[in-house]
Amino acid sequence: MTILLCFFLVSLLTIVSSIFLKQNKTSKFNLPPSPSSLPIIGNLHHLAGLPHRCFHKLSIKYGPLVFLRLGSVPVVVISSSEAAEAVLKTNDLECCSRPKTVGSGKLSYGFKDITFAPYGEYWREVRKLAVIELFSSKKVQSFRYIREEEVDFVVKKVSESALKQSPVDLSKTFFSLTASIICRVALGQNFNESGFVIDQDRIEELVTESAEALGTFTFSDFFPGGLGRFVDWLFQRHKKINKVFKELDAFYQHVIDDHLKPEGRKNQDIVTLILDMIDKQEDSDSFKLNMDNLKAIVMDVFLAGIDTSAVTMIWAMTELIRNPRVMKKAQESIRTTLGLKKERITEEDLGKVEYLNHILKETFRLHPALPFVVPRETMSHIKIQGYDIPPKTQIQLNVWTIGRDPKRWNDPEEFNPERFANSSVDFRGQHFDLLPFGSGRRICPGMPMAIASVELALMNLLYYFDWSMPDGTKGEDIDMEEAGNISIVKKIPLQLVPVQRY
């Protein structure tokens, strides 16, 4: 029976594949260069490893635009700033939708969030809500005290390790910091108060598992339709995604139930803001929110806010310990600017140290937390650098490769913040050499919140402490192996020894 089933699947996939290959060969489009493909799977065999590095190798051989067919899904990989500008600026509207995958659909409650919602009226309304109500400058400032309190707590814990001369697991420290900030900002939940439904370690594990679920491709993603769903069912490909979703949903529901109790909305967190909007809705309103919309928006803030900021800080401190000259200059710049023996560093001090801003930019260039801009999908036929990009083509922008382009950057593999000293290049979406938050209509709305958290934490740790490798090892020997799928983090946790300076 099993042999017959396998024979049936292979035969069916071969027929389907031959149809797609025939269509591709007879295509009237001038498609970008493409590596050789195989029956059924297309170019999937080229993805043996971390995707950003696999696509990087293809771009070296085939150029800044590469056409792939992943199963039956057409994909164009963008690997230059010029091509990125053509997508994100020139053709922003035509490339403004999102491809639908099983993982993103499940965790976003059917694409009811901001990040994965397809382009249309719903996305415009929910995006407006995010920009005006949730992440406006005024709202980000209102959460300033939370960021300052949580960074103060980190400084206190690191000071305790400094007294013992014991190493600090900075990977865990940064994930704990961002989780604490986001849980208070988004959910009104404080790890340090009793009654928290999930302990902090489980929160961090859940974020990692959720990122894996979002980055786990199923047969349905590559072979849309009944056949893909059948193979997924046969091999239980949705099991892990459903398990993570079930735990996240229970967590969100617990938080919402707490907010619905009397005195449950004493904090002006994001859940409170959206529940208040739901309460004020009228029957005649054309745009209405429900609990699934709320959970989907919280999912965006919760997962993206915790993961990406922590990953950025880990890579920044990793590069600083590997480059003592840069570390020393950063500490001297911060200490000279802020003065000696400063009791507390707050967000009033942000923006005062230009060299720290250069370090952030250089970290975003070499180690973007997300090596790809969240994938886009073309809604109509467009042309990029003379090549045809048909409708319903997935666009993958490899910002990791763009940040290492030797045509745009001198010594691209070197961590050198000084390259930004006389440069106007910034990370806010107007310069296509540096795109950690994307650009155009779908730029990340949480960018101001993320930058404030990262800069405040790094400024504190570099001001109050000197840092060294444990057990007499040297920074140049540190392991730089990457891990992950959607976000790329240092595989081996970063452990450093702090020495109290002030």
Curated annotation (Swiss-Prot):
Q: Which SUPFAM superfamilies match?
A: Cytochrome P450
**Chain coiled-coil ranges:** none
Q: Which cofactor does it need?
A: heme
Using the UniProt record, name the top-level EC class of this enzyme in a single word: oxidoreductase
Q: What is the membrane topology here?
A: Single-pass membrane protein
- Any idea where this protein resides? Membrane
Q: Which residues bind heme?
A: C444
Q: Which GO terms describe its molecular function?
A: heme binding; iron ion binding; monooxygenase activity; oxidoreductase activity, acting on paired donors, with incorporation or reduction of molecular oxygen
Q: Which domain of life is it from?
A: Eukaryota
EC numbers, comma separated: 1.14.-.-
- Annotated membrane-spanning segments are 1-21
Tissue expression per record: Expressed in root, leaf and influorescence stem of 3-4 week plants.
Enumerate the PROSITE patterns for this protein.
Answer: CYTOCHROME_P450
Q: Which GO terms describe its cellular component?
A: extracellular region; membrane
Q: Is Metal-binding one of the keywords?
A: yes
The protein in question is named Cytochrome P450 71B2
**What organism, scientifically named, is this protein from?**
Arabidopsis thaliana
